[in-house]
Amino acid sequence: MAKLTGFMDYTRKTSTDVPPLERIENFNEFHIWLSREEQQTQAARCMDCGVPFCQAGMMIGGMASGCPLNNLIPEWNDLVYQGKWELALRRLRTTNRFPEFTSRVCPALCEAACTCGDVTGSSVTVRENEHAIVETGYAKGWLHAAPPPARTGKSVAIIGSGPSGLSVAEYLNIRGHAVTVFERADRVGGLLMYGIPNMKLDKSVIERRIKIMQAEGVEFRTNMDVGGAVDAAEILNSYDAIVLCCGAKKARDLNVPGRDAKGVYLAVDYLTSVTRSLLDSKFADGRAINAAGRNVLIIGGGDTGNDCQGTALRQGCTDLVALEMMPQPPKERAANNPWPEWPKVLKVDYGQTECLAKFGKDPRVYQTTVKEFLKDDAGNLTGAVISYLKPQRDPDTGRTSMVPTGEEFTYDCQLAFIAAGFVGCEDYVAEAFGVERNARGNVADHGFRTNVDKVFVCGDMRRGQSLVVWGLREGRDCAAEVDRYLMGYTNL
């Protein structure tokens, strides 16, 4: 453990942020991290809690409690406290090969399950400790290419380069298999590259990691739309195993009048256009969907909706409203949501903080949905009719659904982004490989194996939309199954 009395001696201290009105002037990361010395003090707060739920990764109430990767959190907290940064990095990478990603975008399931947080009211700064470890590793030159000492002679094609694709590629390459990753976009990274804005995950962080993987022998092929322009049968015939890691990219849409109005977009298309234009030309090409000078309506209150808020503010939108279908969560845990369950409480993310600073309001309007999009004679979006909702319980099934109250209001807007989640993987890749899907629209599997010989599946394409950390866990577990299939056993 770290310092015996650390959780009593020190209070929680986290990184500060660039002020909201200053940071929305650009798309840069905005956290001002603690010094290594300050981070060592924070690591000292990790207590000898007996049952470290922070690393449990168990499902409670349908949600994860603790880290899905089962990171050895108490171990590397102790090592950080002692100043043994290189050893802390080694212990961290035992379970997580991509801490530079999770330390930036993970919602810190570990901290929500932290015993210190339950005892003192403030958890250990696990995510920021992780960030300090990995960035110290890069700064000191400890993170560099380490190709496998021998090759097995087996080849694996991985379709998709998002979190699960990168994870399965990493582990199979460590094992010595020849790994080729096919990505349909022009850059590697999938969700990490185009689904998460640059201010949340700077794309140089992804590129830095990809260069190491390439130096270790992983081959990346971009602009390769397998199942589309690239024949799936050719891939099947050319590799000893194939892993489908194409995500759950079929977005949930709104089937309401006026959906065809010019100015209504799926959120993922919006975020992709902005990041691509930023990387290609620093917005000089004018190809990004642009919220400048426009009122923006965002439908959906999850991470993607929040990212749309932050992006629209940086572009210079004139107003912002975000619709949330469900009731506003409580500020404190309810009696039926005890620790160490994930806390179902009201959270204020960076997008809401920035909107409050810019417009003096939280953009979220709870228990609402779009009834109709309004448009002018040219088909341009001019507004939306928004219905208020109320929960209603079905006496026969016991299920609760949100139904209209009959009360409505109209919001004048010129852009609307639908961030209502995803309903499964896209059809064409699954159909091209002939793999079966389940009722939820995900590829059906038996221990990551599909119904087609030598074709595996992992990540959101298998489990449905989830977190980056779950994608990394899926890739790690799937790699072991692929290795077992190829070699008859696995040491992953």
Predicted regions and their residues:
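Glycine-rich FAD pyrophosphate-binding loop
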Residues: 177-193, 320-330
